[in-house]
Amino acid sequence: HLRFIASVGEPLNAEAVWWGKRVLGLPIHDNWWQTETGGIMVANTPAFAIKPGSMGRPLPGVDVVVVDHDQETGEVTVIDKPDVEGELALRVGWPSMFRGYLGDEARSRACFTGEWYRSGDLVRQDAEGWLWFVGRADDVIKVAGNRIGTAEVESALVSHEAVAEAAVIGKPHRTAGEA
């Protein structure tokens, strides 16, 4: 008898959570982790009602912040307002956390800022602490000076009942940058 369904990896669209509830009789609990973190750090635990489309909340003992990383100066600033897009950062120090990329010192230095590991995932955190995946920092296209996360556009497209799957890529444009 199936009692619990969890997912980790690519973020689930909210529609998948509703599908699980409708077809399987159980919601799908989406979770977040990276190989670099060594385990699930953010989760939709069974103790709380699921917010479909959310990655969940940090597990007890896991400190996360949303940061703004200035590409030009390298400065990292913690965003302390809810619902503002930024990069997910986790406080380092748990035993399973990787120490760096083998043979790639520059990449290793780039993802650690002080006591924080910058994940490369763009998120927003609501006032209740739930995290919402926006896209990858390296998966953003620039259109007429605006940064657009392709995952956000894909999510909007697949929320329509006539769309099963979607993929968004940037196409070079003379005046808009990408379109």
Task: State what each model feature region is.
Residues 18, 53, 106, 155:
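Active-site phosphate/pyrophosphate- and oxyanion-stabilizing loops and adjacent acidic/basic residues
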Residues 94, 99-100, 107, 122-179:
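AMP-binding/adenylate-forming catalytic core of the ANL superfamily
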Residues 9, 33, 56, 121, ...:
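Active-site glycine-centered loops adjacent to acidic/histidine catalytic or metal-binding residues
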Residues 48-54, 75-77:
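Short, P/G- and charge-enriched loop/turn segments at secondary-structure junctions
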Residues 54-61, 117:
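Short coil-to-beta-strand transition motifs
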Residues 1-51, 63:
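Gly/Ser/Thr-rich phosphate-binding loop
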Residues 68-74, 126, 174:
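Short, acidic, Ser/Thr-enriched surface-loop or helix-capping motifs
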Residues 58-61, 72-110, 148:
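Conserved ATP/PPi-binding loop(s) of AMP-dependent carboxylate-activating enzymes
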